[in-house]
Curated annotation (Swiss-Prot):
Localisation: Plastid, Chloroplast
Cofactor binding annotation: Binds 1 Mg(2+) ion per subunit.
Molecular functions per Gene Ontology: DNA binding; DNA-directed RNA polymerase activity; magnesium ion binding; zinc ion binding
Pfam families on file: RNA_pol_Rpb1_1, RNA_pol_Rpb1_2
Function of the protein: DNA-dependent RNA polymerase catalyzes the transcription of DNA into RNA using the four ribonucleoside triphosphates as substrates.
Chain residues that bind Mg(2+): 490, 492, 494
Protein name (database record): DNA-directed RNA polymerase subunit beta'
SMART domains linked to this entry: RPOLA_N
Family: Belongs to the RNA polymerase beta' chain family. RpoC1 subfamily.
Assembly and oligomerization: In plastids the minimal PEP RNA polymerase catalytic core is composed of four subunits: alpha, beta, beta', and beta''. When a (nuclear-encoded) sigma factor is associated with the core the holoenzyme is formed, which can initiate transcription.
HAMAP family: RNApol_bact_RpoC1
Length: 681
């Protein structure tokens, strides 16, 4: 529906019988009104056409084929000059067949039926509004007992029985004869009330405002009694009663605010869903497969017609038989709306539980959550996230299997433009065969197209961010660990969805506002949100720990160098290993990749003279002289090579490969920041 402010919204609630009939009724040119489903049939077994006035009737729900009636006549849809709009023979309207997705019908119930959601769901709305026990109302609804209506100056049951005794002297046969006459129906309807009709009468009588006022007065009185009496049992009883009164007042105010009549909780007309929402399809071998709701509708129509026959005919029917049939109609409608709510669910011939209307709409796979609220969208995928430590902050790794599906239309367009494929079919076959040209075009497409990553629940705007995708091996999405906190995700099996923005506006928004390197601060408090996590800090610690004892320890001892404190060393096989010297960090990293040194192995790295590492008052630990007159001054963490004239020739610092890697990463990050700053200014 659309309100006065033109906001589209969906409201779920009870509907009046007039509204139900307005949804379904159509007036034919001959004045006949169609919309009521009276027959429990679906398709004719010979012609395979919908039965007239059945659950798939074309007069009620529209044609199966657009513009073709049940007779086979054809009219152009949308041509107003074509007259008439309905077929004169079969009464089918010449419209699009998509009308069968929303055109409804209805079943006119022979007796009122209580809506089981309002009766059996806890808390029971009917029990709350009438202030009666639920078991008492259930006994009344299912005709287990009845109550007498207030009468005034009308013949009672005893007086009527006396009139029969005057005609038939034998009291033994007078009462049974009275219960089998047609006059008993009039008497029962006037003085005895049972079934859902009795509930409807009680819901129509009270004034909602009076209910609200009386409940408020009682709630205040109970509050005073609870404060005066100190009995714990009585206090609990009063507390439960006060909670019930609050629910009753809220329910009455809701009916007043929404202008809904409480008697609508009792059904007189049962809506019939459009046929496309409860289809009958043919599987392999021509065997039909029907929705469970069709079988439940047929059950309702069968029992309703069985009850309608004795009520419309002139012959007399025992009252107990009528009450029993009303109970069967009530149970059939209950099964249609919510199978199993009253105990054992109804099953088919294969002992499979029928799927009722409640089962269709509720739950994760229901109509609302699957197709309306959380429905799946095109150009999207989902997979587990893992750490991508080599990724940049604004990049994410997409598996090839996901990427080729997300960007398949773009790849097809690229194959056709490069004349690799002449049509869409050939392009799809090349994609299925995974030819090398496909991955090349995919790389080109992904370079200029950002993707959106989302982790549910999206509680703030950082729950969905944009990234530049790159192809990775495997089946998991790779993510930089620093963006984890914004998504509130963990790398322990969490899943994230990936979406492709299609329009230029969406792509511009993703690049300008949603990229991860542009969302470094929390939108709530302004604190940095991309901060190192504990595992990152531990990794940096292991990377830079090196030899904590420094040069004063036995630097040639392998157990000190590798920090294996619990490892036993065989001193008989001990050999003195000299710490290597490297002219540049590239040489040191190359030696590490060749596995000539370890990550924490101490080494000497040549340092530039313009970067000072010399402490003015530091005394060398050791001085080593060479034959040519040069000498080495060894300090705690560096070494100076001097000439004969005491000039500094070069400087070496004592470090590890881990320190070198960490230093280079920081240096590159600072240089990149400076370049970006200069570019912006």
């Amino acid at each position: 529906m659309i309100d006065r402010y033109k906001h589209q919204q969906l409201r779920i609630g009870s509907v009046s019988p007039q509204q139900i009939s307005a949804w379904a009724n159509k007036i034919l040119p001959n004045g006949e009104i169609v919309g009521e489903v009276t027959k429990p049939y679906t398709f004719h077994y010979k012609t395979n056409k919908p039965e007239k006035d059945g659950l798939f009737c074309e007069r009620i729900f529209g044609p199966i084929k657009s513009g073709i009636c049940a007779c086979g006549n054809y009219r152009v849809i949308g041509n107003e000059k074509e007259d008439p709009k309905f077929c004169e023979q079969c009464g089918v309207e010449f419209v699009d067949s998509r009308i069968r997705r929303y055109q409804m019908g209805y079943i006119k119930l022979a007796c009122p039926v209580t809506h089981v959601w309002y009766l059996k769901r806890l808390p029971s709305y009917i029990a709350s509004l009438l202030d009666k026990p639920l078991k008492e109302l259930e006994g009344l609804v299912y005709c287990d007992f009845s109550f007498a209506r207030p009468i005034a100056k009308k013949p009672t049951f005893l007086r009527l029985r006396g009139s029969f005794e005057s005609e038939i002297q034998s009291r033994k046969y007078s009462i049974p004869l009275f219960f089998t006459t047609q006059d008993f129906d009039t008497f029962r309807n006037r003085e005895i009330s049972t079934g859902a009709g009795a509930i409807k009468e009680q819901l129509a009588d009270p004034d909602l405002r009076i209910i609200t006022d009386h409940s408020l007065v009682e709630w205040k009185e109970l509050g005073e009694e609870g404060s005066a009496d100190g009995n714990e049992w009585e206090d609990r009883k009063i507390g439960r009663r006060k909670d019930f009164l609050v629910r009753r007042m809220e329910l009455a105010k809701h009916f007043i605010r929404t202008n809904v009549e409480p008697e609508r909780m009792v059904l007189c007309l049962l809506p019939v869903l459009p046929p496309e929402l409860r289809p009958i399809i043919q599987i392999d071998g021509g065997k039909p497969m029907s929705s469970d709701i069709n079988e439940l509708y047929r059950r309702v129509i069968y029992r309703n017609n069985t009850l309608t026959d004795p009520l419309t005919t002139s012959r007399s029917t025992p009252g107990e038989s009528v009450m029993c049939q009303e109970k069967l109609v009530q149970e059939a409608v209950d099964t249609l709306l919510d199978n199993g709510i009253r105990g054992q669910p109804m099953r088919d011939g294969h002992n499979k539980v029928y799927k009722s209307f409640s089962d269709v709409i509720e739950g994760k796979e229901g109509r609302f959550r699957e197709t309306l609220l959380g429905k799946r969208v095109d150009y999207s995928g989902r997979s587990v996230i893992v750490v991508g430590p080599s990724l940049s902050l604004h990049r994410c790794g997409l598996p090839r299997e996901i990427a080729i599906e997300l960007f398949q239309t773009f790849v097809i367009r690229g194959l056709i433009r490069q004349h690799v494929a002449s049509n869409i079919g050939i392009a799809k076959s090349k994609i299925r065969e995974k030819e090398p040209i496909v991955w090349e075009i995919l790389q080109e497409v992904m370079q200029g197209h950002p993707v959106l990553l989302n982790r549910a629940p999206t509680l703030h705007r950082l729950g969905i961010q944009a990234f530049q995708p790159i192809l990775v091996e495997g089946r998991a999405i790779c993510l930089h660990p620093l963006v984890r906190k914004g998504f509130n995700a963990d790398f322990d099996g969490d899943q994230m969805a990936v979406h492709v923005p299609l329009s230029l506006e969406a792509q511009a928004e993703a690049r300008l506002l949603m990229f991860s390197h542009m969302n470094l601060l929390s939108p709530a408090i302004g604190d940095p949100i991309s901060v190192p996590t504990q595992d990152m800090l531990i990794g940096l610690y292991i990377l830079t720990i090196g030899n904590r004892r420094g040069i004063c320890s036995n630097r040639y001892n392998p157990c000190n160098r590798r920090n294996y404190q619990n490892e036993t060393v065989d001193y008989n096989k001990y050999t003195k290993e000299k710490e290597p010297y490297f002219c540049s960090s590239y040489d040191a990293l190359g030696a590490y990749r060749q596995k000539r040194i370890n990550l924490d192995s101490p080494l000497w790295l040549r340092w530039r003279l313009d970067q000072r590492v010399i402490a003015s008052r530091e005394v060398p630990i050791e001085v080593q002289y060479e034959s040519l007159g040069t000498y080495h001054e060894i300090y705690g963490h560096y070494l100076i090579v001097r000439s004969v004239k005491k000039e500094i020739l070069c400087i070496y610092i004592r470090t590890t490969v881990g320190h070198i890697s960490f230093y280079r990463e920081i240096e590159e990050a600072i240089q990149g920041f400076c370049r970006a700053y200069l570019y912006d200014t």
